[in-house]
Amino acid sequence: GLGTGLTMAAMMGLAAVASATSVPLADVLGDWSRSLLVWTPLAALALVVWVPVARAAHRHPEREEVPEDVTHALPWASATAWLVAAYLTAQSWQFYSALAWLAPTYEAHGWTAREAGLLMAAFTGAQLLSGLAAPTLLDHVPDPRLLLVLAGLLGGAGELGVWLAPDTAPWLWAGLLGAGQGAAFALGLALLVRYAATPRDSARLTAMAFLVSYTAAAFGPAAMGVVEDVTGSFSLVWALLALVMVPQLILSLRLRPDLARVGAQID
């Protein structure tokens, strides 16, 4: 739980910094492409740090006794795997759509690009905090449904706020949206471990869940963009995202702690 939270905090923390500084950097450097180049050294540093780790892992693989009849196939026949994949699909569709369209929504309401960038920083900053807290709390809660539903309600409140009263409390809506999405995603990552019988089964579950959820969620931003093009407004976009939260909440309630683990069943 804590490891998942720290990973989320690192990702969202740097994303918040990038959101807040990219537009000012573009103003200073005179071009948005130069602003993006500023982040190249960080990517290069990550590569430099990771290469030795990958080489060491390849030279000294962990010794694990694997039964001869162990399966490496994805758990397509597992009902638990499909529940987790469906949950992550609903969450990812909303997250990537919000990531793509929150700033343009407020630019359409008269905000400058810099102001919209700061709003995105608040959105990702809230994800940092909730993404760190949620999986840590999950370690101390026997039933994940309470945290899953709470995350969904926070995110849904943010979506409803942007839809129904976008100019009333935009910073609050961005914070609620970020807190809900950050917690929901971090909890989803933790479920990939909780609902697996072994680390090897967790890898199988993760591969299947990510294949399903990211393939479906990749269409989210584009589909919401089509809605905006057709209607000429972002209002219906946020109404639809709030509607997608309904199946996420239903799936959250079905993720009981006593579900059969992937690998502990024939899948």
Mark where each language-model region is.
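Structural signature of the two symmetry-related core transmembrane helices
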Residues: L146-L160
